[in-house]
């Protein structure tokens, strides 16, 4: 006689094993999926695409999502964040307002680069050297400071600079690429331009530029850090180890940005990874 109770028990046990296996498989798959949030800034674009290329070489599935910095900090602070990590946090100054708002719900994983600077930039042929000299040459600059997105920390710092130095200038909101295009046109025509700038950025290699002196100390020095959502390291330990070890010298970061600028985001990152595979694989 067929023992229905025994068969039912076997079926239940099999179902439980299959279910647990599916759960473990899903967890394993999720551990190999990483979502990187990044801003439209040259170093953020370059580093994020390098991370994508390097992790995909180890069978990770990587998604890149472009957002303004404020939205990135806010998204990563959510309990059910759609993102995992952000490689371009400028702290402790430039992104300080975002860290004050969201830092308690974020994890600082490490520092990629020390010595990030921001300020107002002019071509070297412009014969002024200080922010304090801008008002005397308002007409040559058309009364405009060419900026980037309003969500960027340097945008807020420049509003403070306008106030601190009592500048009769307007900050023009654009984007990182649009700002570079404006500098390129001005340099081509040898016209005057003042723009928000930062290092590291590939524009310093492409154009002969200089910072204007900032005697009031509006623009500080920062490090570039890796910020993640809470629980990222527990959920995806292999990916987390890679990001915690992600470090670049100034020379390496400039070379990476230059490769991306000249060859495109994916191709440039792949070329730089191939040439520096030992370095990058050492982060894994």
Name each region found by the language model.
Residues 18-22:
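C-terminal motif of bacterial Sec signal peptides marking the signal peptidase cleavage site
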Residues 28-43, 60-65, 142-146, 243:
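Short, well-ordered beta-strand elements
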Residues 41-42, 63-76, 171-182:
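Short helix-initiation/N-cap motifs at beta->coil->alpha
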Residues 48, 68-104, 181-182, 202-208:
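Pocket-flanking alpha-helical
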Residues 51-59, 136-172, 274:
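Ligand-binding cleft/hinge of the Venus flytrap
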Residues 103-150:
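A conserved helix-loop-strand patch within extracytoplasmic ligand-binding domains
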Residues 105-113, 192-196, 205-220:
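Short beta-strand->loop
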Residues 117-127, 222-236, 242:
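A bilobed periplasmic-binding-protein/Venus flytrap-type ligand-binding module shared by bacterial periplasmic
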């Amino acid at each position: 006689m067929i023992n229905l109770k025994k068969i039912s028990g076997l079926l239940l046990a099999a179902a439980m094993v299959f279910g647990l296996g599916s759960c473990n498989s899903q967890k394993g798959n999720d551990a190999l999926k990483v979502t990187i949030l990044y801003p439209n800034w040259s170093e953020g674009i370059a580093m994020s695409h390098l991370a994508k290329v390097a992790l995909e070489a180890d069978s990770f599935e990587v998604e890149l999502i472009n957002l303004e910095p404020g939205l990135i900090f806010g998204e990563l602070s959510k309990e059910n964040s759609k993102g995992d990590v952000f490689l371009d946090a400028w702290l402790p100054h430039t992104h300080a307002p975002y860290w004050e708002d969201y830092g308690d719900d974020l994890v600082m994983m490490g520092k990629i680069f020390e010595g990030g600077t921001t300020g107002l930039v002019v071509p070297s042929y412009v014969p002024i050297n200080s922010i304090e000299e801008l008002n005397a040459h308002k007409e040559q600059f058309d009364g405009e400071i060419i900026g980037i997105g309003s969500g960027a920390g340097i945008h807020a710092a420049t509003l403070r600079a306008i106030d601190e130095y009592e500048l009769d200038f307007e900050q023009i909101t654009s984007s990182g690429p649009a700002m570079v295009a404006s500098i390129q046109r001005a340099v081509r025509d040898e016209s005057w331009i003042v723009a928000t700038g930062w290092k590291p950025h590939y524009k310093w290699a492409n154009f002969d530029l200089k910072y204007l002196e900032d005697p009031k100390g509006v623009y500080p020095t920062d490090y570039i850090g890796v910020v993640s959502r809470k629980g990222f390291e527990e959920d995806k330990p292999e990916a987390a180890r890679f990001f915690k070890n992600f470090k670049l010298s100034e020379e390496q970061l400039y070379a990476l940005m230059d490769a991306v600028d000249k060859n495109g985001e994916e191709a440039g990152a792949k070329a730089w990874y191939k040439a520096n595979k030992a370095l990058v694989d050492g982060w894994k």
